[in-house]
Regions:
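Positively charged n-region of N-terminal signal peptides that target proteins for export
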Residues: 1-4
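Bacterial N-terminal signal peptides
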Residues: 6-16
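Disordered, low-complexity segments in secreted/periplasmic proteins that are enriched in proline
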Residues: 20-38, 45, 57, 163
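Flexible, processing/modification-adjacent segments and terminal tails
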Residues: 35-38, 67-78, 151-240, 250-255, ...
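Gly/Pro-enriched, hydrophobic low-complexity segments
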Residues: 37, 203-315
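N-terminal mature ectodomain segment of secretory-pathway/periplasmic proteins
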Residues: 42-162, 192-205, 213-215
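Short amphipathic beta-strand/extended segments with alternating polar/hydrophobic composition
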Residues: 115-120, 143-152, 163-174, 221-225, ...
Length: 319
């Protein structure tokens, strides 16, 4: 569902030449490059994607990342930077392409709530894809041990992680919006909306970023709270301004999915040696009713997670 760009000569900017410029954009990287920024076209979307590279530690070659479109506004860039998505001298705002986290808590199960224990969620925002490895106790008291997956336009269940697939095509529309219910997933939507993202204010002064990704058509609104009183989060000291997503709504298929985020942690308290931060209390709703109440016990950004689409999910025989 995402755009695929060939890294042609015209689209790839040599990392050495780019990073030799004075300054840059992105936290801790100095001032912006000299010269006027490129203009946003009337369409509200960047004309094409451009990429820059940086050298890996230990001489492991170059890694390329997508430079933020000139159509992506100041508020979106600042929030992306606050949670670790905005990086580098030539700013990229998609530095988090996936997450893996484990939770305890509750999740809707028929007419009741299942109790979750060490449930793992894997999300790849660039595909998009998600795997929910649900463990715990169902609302009826029976053991819960299910693996629910979607990737691209397909949905299926697994007997084991990556194995024993059975089709679950009729669940796709219920699974896709869940990927928006994390700070990173929500921000991917308003980033992809580029110049079409609308910035507004709530009555109590919070910022709301509303945009629809052209790749899935889901309207997402991210409520952002500016804070100078918080624990140390990544590189942000406790009295330093940080802009945190605290709530999200995602409208899809005639329903409204919601999420609230609290108790952010980062650095050694959540994921060692990185700047990404993540809420440890997450609550989801569906049409205003409780859907999940999650306490995060483990988190990793950009983990190695894969979502090979099985033949059965595509309606084909594996023989």
């Amino acid at each position: 569902m995402r755009r695929a760009f060939a890294l042609g000569v015209g689209a790839v900017l040599a990392g050495g030449a780019l990073l030799a410029q004075e300054g840059g954009g992105g936290r801790g990287m100095g001032a912006a490059p000299a010269g006027p920024p490129p203009a946003c076209p009337p369409s509200g979307y960047g004309a094409q994607a451009y990429y820059a590279g940086f050298g890996q530690n230990g001489g492991d070659g170059q890694t390329f990342y997508e430079i933020a479109s000139p159509c992506i506004g100041k508020d979106v860039r600042e929030v992306a930077e606050s949670i670790g998505m905005g990086r580098n001298k030539l700013m990229g705002v998609k530095s988090v392409i996936g997450v893996q986290f484990r939770v305890d808590g509750t999740m809707a199960d028929g007419g009741g709530m299942a109790k979750l224990a060490n449930t793992e969620l894997q999300m790849a925002y660039y595909i998009p894809a998600m795997r929910m490895m649900l463990k715990g106790t169902k609302a009826n008291g029976q053991p819960l041990n299910e693996i629910r997956v979607f990737a691209d336009q397909y949905a299926w269940n697994e007997a084991q992680e990556g194995r024993g697939a059975t089709t679950a095509a009729n669940t796709f529309n219920d699974r896709l919006p869940l990927i928006k219910l994390t700070p990173f997933g929500a921000m991917w939507s308003v980033i992809e909306a580029e110049g079409h993202t609308v910035v507004s204010k709530t009555a109590d002064g919070k910022t709301v970023l509303t945009g629809t990704s052209p790749y899935d058509g889901i309207e997402v609104a991210v409520t952002v709270e500016d804070s100078r009183q918080h624990p140390k989060l990544g590189p942000y000291d406790p009295t330093e301004l940080i802009r945190l997503p605290v709530a999200v709504t995602a409208k899809a298929n005639g329903h409204t999915w919601g999420a609230t985020f609290a108790d952010y942690l980062g650095g050694t308290k959540l994921e060692p040696d990185v700047w990404m931060i993540f809420p440890t209390t997450i609550k989801w709703t569906l049409d205003g009713k409780p859907y999940a109440d999650l306490k995060v016990t483990y988190f990793r950004s950009n983990p190695y997670i894969v979502f090979p689409i099985p033949d059965v999910a595509k309606g084909r025989s594996s023989n």
